[in-house]
Curated annotation (Swiss-Prot):
The organism's taxonomic lineage, starting at the top: Bacteria, Pseudomonadati, Chlorobiota, Chlorobiia, Chlorobiales
Domain of life: Bacteria
Gene name per UniProt: atpB
Summary of subunit composition and partner proteins: F-type ATPases have 2 components, CF(1) - the catalytic core - and CF(0) - the membrane proton channel. CF(1) has five subunits: alpha(3), beta(3), gamma(1), delta(1), epsilon(1). CF(0) has four main subunits: a, b, b' and c.
Record's bilayer topology term: Multi-pass membrane protein
Keyword Lyase: no
CDD domains reported in the protein's UniProt record: ATP-synt_Fo_a_6
Protein name in the entry: ATP synthase subunit a
Entry's Gene Ontology cellular component terms: plasma membrane; proton-transporting ATP synthase complex
Gene3D superfamilies hit by this protein: ATP synthase, F0 complex, subunit A (1.20.120.220)
Length: 345
């Protein structure tokens, strides 16, 4: 049956075989701490000793406050940025190996480990769901995780892939499903204690967008051939305008993957910065009232909002990928309809 074939782990493993090279990509992270300001220079002794002492005390208080804000900012950046250390506060931390080959940093970093974990989780989930379909009756509704996965798979298959690509959507479905669940688990893992949001790393989002870009161009070449693909770069204009249209159309090929990259990266990074900033407000102001009235309630609200954003961003990336594939492979009859749909989104 069609439903049973969707849950074959082999289909997802094949796509992961293409996606997994990004897991070995090293990310260079600047871990340098800001240098502390030098000690206040020696000042002349004046007759008014009381005024000098007051000025010195005020300066020291201002310096301590600035140092506290700077330290809070360092902690926030430490949780957002990639690193060669996985912290398990208060139990300690694990140093990850640094690997440099021919001058290229391919070190195993925190986000690389998270990508490995996400890959294992996605494969395990669908392997478990496939096991239920093999052992259960075809007439019996799936239960538990298999039921939830089937609902999401049907949604991506019908409302995303089929709706945006149309005829022949089946051959792109394994990629779209893999991208959706991969991004979703990446986003959710960043909300778990000791986890990290790999999709908050622009290297990861750029790699995912690059896969969509190449798949889109392959779909265009298959649908229109070399001649039709190159003719699209001229935009159907007079040859005198080709010198203008070709560069514009060529640049336009790369605006879509860049938009995918920035959209996912910015949204997943911004939410975590807001949560951590709200938490640290109470520490900076040293006020329990601020913590109870503002920091904690707003942090919980933003955290719940992040759960929604995790699903939303996975859906948007997958939907736009399907839309770009549909635009690239659409023939002249359906081109205007796809263009109108793209403009609407």
């Amino acid at each position: 049956m069609e439903r049973s074939s969707i849950f074959q782990p082999k289909r997802f493993v094949k796509v992961f075989a293409v996606l997994l090279p990004l897991l070995f990509n090293g990310y260079s992270v600047s871990g340098a701490n800001p240098t502390e300001a030098p000690v206040a220079q020696h000042t002349e002794v004046t007759a008014n000793a009381a005024e000098s002492a007051h000025v010195a005390e005020a300066g020291a208080a201002h310096g301590a406050e600035g140092h506290g804000e700077e330290k809070a900012g360092d902690v926030i950046m430490h949780h957002i940025l990639d690193s060669n250390v996985i912290a398990f506060d208060p139990f300690g931390e694990v140093d990850l190996p640094k690997i440099v080959v021919a001058g290229f940093d391919i070190s195993i970093t925190k986000h690389v480990v998270m990508l490995w974990v996400v890959s294992a989780i996605v494969i395990a989930l669908f392997a478990a769901a496939n096991g239920q379909y093999k052992t259960g009756s075809a007439m019996r509704a799936p239960k538990g995780i298999a039921n939830a996965l089937e609902a999401l798979v049907d949604f991506i298959r019908l409302d995303v892939a089929k709706a945006n690509i149309g005829k022949g959507y089946e051959k792109y479905l394994p990629y779209l499903l893999t991208v959706f669940f991969f991004i979703l688990v990446c986003n959710l893992l960043g909300l778990v204690p000791y986890g990290a949001t790999a999709t908050g790393n622009i290297n990861v989002t750029l790699t995912l967008a690059t896969f969509t870009f190449f798949l889109t161009q392959a779909a265009a070449l298959k649908a229109h051939g070399i001649k039709g693909y190159l003719a699209h770069l001229t935009g159907g204009t007079h040859p005198a305008l080709w010198i203008i249209m070709i560069p514009i159309e060529f640049i336009g090929l790369f605006t879509k993957p860049v938009a995918l990259t920035i959209r996912l990266f910015a949204n997943m990074t911004a939410g975590h910065i807001v949560i951590l900033s709200l938490i640290f407000i109470s520490f900076i102001l040293k006020s329990y009232i601020v913590a109870v009235v503002m920091s904690v309630p707003f942090s919980i609200f933003i955290y719940l909002l992040e759960l929604f954003v995790a699903f939303l961003q996975a859906f948007i990336f997958t939907m736009l990928s399907a839309l770009f594939i549909g635009l690239a492979s659409a023939h002249e009859g359906g081109h205007d309809e796809h263009e109108a749909s793209a403009a609407h989104h």
